Regions:
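Bacterial N-terminal signal peptides
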Residues: 2-12
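Bacterial Sec-dependent signal peptides at the C-terminal "C-region" and cleavage site
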Residues: 12-22
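Extracellular beta-strand-rich solenoid/capping regions of secreted or surface-exposed proteins
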Residues: 44-51, 66-100, 109-128, 136-157, ...
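Tight coil/turn sites that cap or link beta-strands
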Residues: 62-63
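Acidic/polar low-complexity surface segments
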Residues: 69-85, 91, 136-241
């Protein structure tokens, strides 16, 4: 019922928005609750309205908008250098012309497996003045606090919840969404770069045998495991499902003054893209 109400708010607001051309304000589709929980339905309704009236610009409200995958556009995508899957997309632009998304300094804070922007068959599009980040990274990491023959003891911060399932390590978020991993890479905690001569451990099963220690830490098990105590072990995401910007068959797209701090794939990927620049 709650999600239906959120979607209804966006549809009702469309009746209040401009009816032809000009600027459209996302605020007309939002209320305080949706901005703080899931602005996705409002964004979806606003973009649909913009396409229908051929608006020149969608202006975001500033501040922070939280966006979830629950009611986002669904689309199965094959994206070069990323992994195919059924995507959830926040800003889905198809066939739009001469259109701008003015972020107005807005921070878009995403939760879960969702792609921020997808543009298909679009021309003369500008996205400007916004920030993209995620509440949880797609990789996971923890500090190496002890080691031995064929094992490492890892202390994970609260940001990276984990448990043991069938004798193997599993990462999840507070809602239970699982974050698979497929490789381990040791990072120098001081220099904040891959450790000198670190081994890149690939995991064909997308997990690793593990056991929980009495102190709450996790001991991961593999014959050839080694690392320096005090360094950080990064558990790399198993797939690139959610690029920041996907541009397919587009012409003249400008991304200006955008801070992309994190995403679940490549930052910007262009397929069959042309530009006069």
């Amino acid at each position: 019922l709650h999600t239906l109400l959120l979607f209804a708010v966006g549809l009702f607001a469309a009746c209040q928005a401009p009816t032809s051309g000009g600027d459209v304000y996302l605020n007309d589709f939002l209320d305080d609750l949706t901005a703080q929980t899931d602005a996705g339905p409002a964004i979806r309704a606003a973009l649909s309205h913009c396409a229908r009236i051929r608006a020149a610009r969608l202006i975001l409200p500033g501040g922070e908008l939280r966006i979830r995958p629950d009611l986002a556009v669904e689309k199965y995508q094959f994206i070069s250098n990323n992994d195919e899957s059924l995507k959830r997309i926040a800003f889905d632009l198809v066939g739009m012309r001469d259109f701008e998304i003015d972020g107005n300094g807005t921070e878009l804070l995403f939760t879960g497996f969702i792609s921020p922007f997808s543009l298909e068959d679009c021309e003369n599009i500008t996205v400007r003045d916004l920030t993209i980040d995620f509440t949880r990274t797609f990789n996971s990491e923890g500090t190496v606090v002890a080691k031995g023959d064929g094992w490492l003891e890892i202390e994970f911060p609260e940001d990276y919840l984990c448990d043991i399932v069938n004798g193997c390590l599993r990462f999840r978020d507070a809602e239970g969404t699982v974050y698979p991993f497929s490789n381990l890479l040791e990072f120098d905690a001081v220099r904040r770069e891959p450790a000198f001569r670190a081994t890149d451990y690939w995991l064909s099963n997308r997990t690793i045998p593990a056991e929980k220690c009495a102190n709450g830490n996790i001991r991961i098990l593999r014959k050839d495991l080694t690392a320096t105590v005090g360094n950080v072990m990064v558990f790399g995401a198993a797939a690139r499902y959610n690029p920041g910007f996907t541009l397919a068959d587009c012409r003249g797209v400008a991304i200006r003054d955008v801070n992309l701090y994190h995403c679940g794939g490549m930052g910007v990927i262009c397929l069959l893209y042309t530009s006069d620049a």
